[in-house]
A protein has these predicted regions:
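Arg/Lys-rich, positively charged N-terminal/basic patches that mediate binding to nucleic acids
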Residues: 1-37
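Residue-level marker of positions within ordered structural domains that often coincide
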Residues: 15, 44, 80
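Short linear functional motifs in flexible/disordered or boundary regions
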Residues: 22, 51, 85-87
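Alpha-helix capping and helix-coil boundary motifs
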Residues: 25, 44-48, 90-91
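A short, surface-exposed loop/turn module that caps and links secondary-structure elements
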Residues: 41-64
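Enriched for short, Lys/Arg-rich terminal
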Residues: 63-109
Length: 109
């Protein structure tokens, strides 16, 4: 699966260990690395490890959350034209591009 980031800053915080340690607790950084590694090797959401699939919440037509306690990652579909099922809904089995738009605490303001 291809993961893009909404900003260079978010990418740097997610990928660069030094910057990540500045903004995230060590446990959150480990979780983030595990999630991003799992997403990057999966062809689609269905290929994710079970422990991640169980933590995914579909919040709207093109948004998903991946939550670990109070730690959350927000993704949106990054396809220009998301694949759709015959009924017109997004076919999540065919989604292979996501954009990470937020990493942090679930209830942060």
């Amino acid at each position: 699966m291809i993961i893009s980031f909404i900003s260079k800053e978010l990418r740097d915080n997610a990928i660069n260990e030094f910057l990540g340690m500045q903004n995230l607790a060590p446990m959150s950084l480990m979780i983030l690395k595990t999630i991003l590694t799992s997403f990057s090797v999966a062809a689609s959401l269905n290929d994710l490890p079970r422990f991640l699939i169980e933590r995914i919440i579909y919040t709207s037509e093109n948004n998903i959350l991946c939550m670990f306690g109070d730690f959350v990652l927000h993704f949106i579909i990054a396809h220009e034209e998301p694949p759709r099922a015959q009924d017109g809904t997004i076919d999540w089995n065919l989604i292979s591009r996501l954009q990470l738009i937020y990493v942090g605490e679930k209830n942060a303001s």
